[in-house]
UniProtKB/Swiss-Prot annotation:
Residues 27-192 form the FAD-binding PCMH-type domain. The gene is murB. This is UDP-N-acetylenolpyruvoylglucosamine reductase. GO terms for cellular component: cytosol. The active site is at residues 171, 221, 291. HAMAP family: MurB (MF_00037). PROSITE patterns: FAD_PCMH.
Length: 302
C-alpha cells in the first residue's frame, strides 16, 4: 500500500508509521499508518478520495491540543491541516484557514485593532479545531463571533455553513456528528481600541498562567463544566488533587487539568479519567462528562 500511496498521491507530504506523540500536547500516542500534510484543498480532496476508494479510514486532526491519542496509534490516514494556515482581514472580518493557529489569529485581530477575539488569546489549537468544538474561555466562545465556515463534506463537496447551521452548543457543533472537514472560517469582529484590546489579552493571559499548569504537557480542560458547578472544584472536593496513575497526575495547580509529569501514556490518562469520574460521582452524585477527545487504538491491539 505504501508504494501505491507514493504513486497515486505523489507530491503530497505523507509520512509513514509516524509517532503521534510528537504532535500532541499530551506527548502521548502511538504511530499513525499515514500522516498527511496537504498544502491546499485540492490535496485534501485527493487524499480523501484515495482513502475512500481503497477502503482506508481517515480523519483530520488540528493542533491536537484537546485530544488524547491511544498508545496503539491510529490506523489509516490522519490529515494535519498545518499548511493551510492563511489569515486575511477585510474590514471588520477575519477569514482564517483551518490550520491557522488560534492564538496567532487573535494577534492578527489585535494588530488591526479588532475586538471580539480576546477570549481566545491563550487557547492552544487551530481554527478548524476551535470551530469543531466551539472553543471558548472567560465568557467568550467561537459561536459568538463566527459568521460561517467552509467545509468539505464526507461526500467530497465544498459547502458553506452559517452560524445557525453549525448548531453550536457548549463545546460542540454539528461537525462532531456529520464528519465534515473544516476548510476555513469567517469571523465578524468590531472596531476597538488597540491598547484596550492588548490590555485585556494580557489580563487573560496572566490569569491563565496563574491558574493553569502550562509548565507540563496536558490535554487542556479534561471535563466539560457541569451545570451549576466547576469540574475542578468537584475533583478537588473529592480529594483527588495530586492523584496520580503512572506518569499522569491531576494537577496540583488546577484540578480540572491532568498533566504528563513523567513519561505518561495514553493508558495512564484514560485510567485516571475513569477513576476521577467514578470518585466524583460517588462523592457528589454528579457525573463528569469528558471534553477531551480520545481516539485511536489501545496498545493491546498492536
Amino acid at each position: 500500500m505504501k508504494d501505491k500511496i507514493r504513486l497515486e498521491l505523489e507530491g503530497i507530504d505523507i509520512r509513514f508509521d509516524e509517532p503521534l506523540k510528537e504532535y500532541t500536547y499530551t506527548k502521548v500516542g502511538g504511530a499513525v499508518d499515514y500522516l498527511a500534510f496537504p498544502r491546499n484543498r485540492y490535496e485534501i480532496v485527493r487524499i480523501v478520495e484515495f482513502a475512500k476508494r481503497e477502503g482506508i479510514p481517515w480523519q483530520v486532526l488540528g493542533n491536537s491540543s484537546n485530544i488524547i491519542v491511544r498508545d496503539g496509534g491510529i490506523r489509516g490516514f490522519v490529515i494535519r491541516m498545518d499548511k493551510l494556515n492563511s489569515v486575511t482581514v477585510s474590514g471588520y472580518t477575519i477569514e482564517a484557514e483551518a490550520g491557522a493557529n488560534l492564538i496567532e489569529t487573535t494577534k492578527v485581530a489585535l494588530f488591526h485593532s479588532l475586538s471580539g477575539f480576546e477570549f481566545a488569546c491563550g487557547i492552544p489549537g487551530s481554527i478548524g479545531g476551535a470551530v469543531y468544538m466551539n472553543a471558548g474561555a472567560y465568557g467568550g466562545e467561537v459561536a459568538h463571533i463566527l459568521v460561517s465556515a467552509q467545509i468539505l463534506t464526507p461526500a467530497g463537496y465544498v459547502e458553506t455553513l452559517d452560524n445557525r447551521e453549525l448548531r453550536f452548543g457548549y463545546r460542540s457543533s454539528i461537525l462532531q456528528e456529520n464528519g465534515a472537514i473544516v476548510l476555513s472560517a469567517k469571523f465578524a469582529l468590531r472596531p476597538g481600541n488597540h491598547t484596550v484590546i492588548q490590555q485585556e489579552m494580557a489580563r487573560l493571559t496572566h490569569l491563565r498562567e496563574l491558574k493553569q499548569p502550562l509548565e507540563y504537557p496536558s490535554c487542556g480542560s479534561v471535563f466539560k463544566r457541569p451545570l451549576g458547578h466547576f469540574a475542578g472544584q468537584l475533583i478537588m472536593d473529592a480529594g483527588l488533587k495530586g492523584y496520580r496513575i503512572g506518569g499522569v497526575e491531576v494537577s496540583e495547580k488546577h484540578a480540572g487539568f491532568m498533566v504528563n509529569i513523567e513519561n505518561g501514556t495514553a493508558s495512564d490518562y484514560e485510567n485516571l479519567i475513569a477513576h476521577v469520574i467514578q470518585v466524583v460521582e460517588k462523592s457528589s452524585g454528579i457525573t463528569l462528562e469528558r471534553e477531551v477527545r480520545i481516539i485511536g487504538d489501545p496498545a493491546d491491539t498492536l
